[in-house]
Amino acid sequence: MLEVERLEVGYGALAALHGVSLTVRPGETVALVGPNGAGKSTLLKAIAGLLAPRAGLVRWEGTPLTGEPAHRIVERGVALVPEGRRLFARMTVRENLELGAFTRRAQAEKEGRLARIYEIFPRLRERDRQLSGSLSGGEQQMLALGRALMGGPRLLLLDEPSLGLAPRVVETIFGILRQLHGEGISLFLVEQNVQAALTLAQRAYLLEGGRVVGEGEGRILLQDEHVRAAYLGPLARRG
């Protein structure tokens, strides 16, 4: 289980997170929604070891992650799929995937894991030797997911996986996330498509101004007046 306890994170004099506490249970999909600038991406980066908290604790499977380097957190079974994909454009699909298999165990199982990624994402197999910079946005998101999966995570941190994608491609990506959830991988999802996120998630947290201001089941939050007014637009407010 992922446990975040009273986490404080900032940038210089600017405080971004104020005592954030939340949990993600084994095999659970949890969404984190909120306005731009609320601190959602900051929280994911702090969990993944890319930002050092000022106070508080991140615990995974009963052991603290706080202060661990990012590569050690991946070895522990937690992987981040960053906003904007963060691929190496001049490297091939296969080379980008192989970068995700940097732990000792992943290296030993690299070929089997590659085969599994190509089973999940057949379009990546078709583009195995293609430069990642020439892929479509949807294919690049599949590659970013695949690279994270090469490390064999038990928890995926997903930062805006639908950003910039056409609706049909978003459906494909979320279908893959449902498949991964069905395989027992825990998902902690930051997503600007609130409708899709709350439909996918068993539970969700609302983050505003760096503070958790609400929590509940995804399907129930979809009907919440504040959530509908703030995040689902005028059509939702009228409906």
Positions of predicted regions on the chain:
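Conserved ABC ATPase signature
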Residues: L131-L135, E139
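Helix-to-loop junction immediately C-terminal to a conserved catalytic motif
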Residues: A48
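Conserved ABC transporter NBD signature motif
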Residues: G56-P64, R76, E109-L114
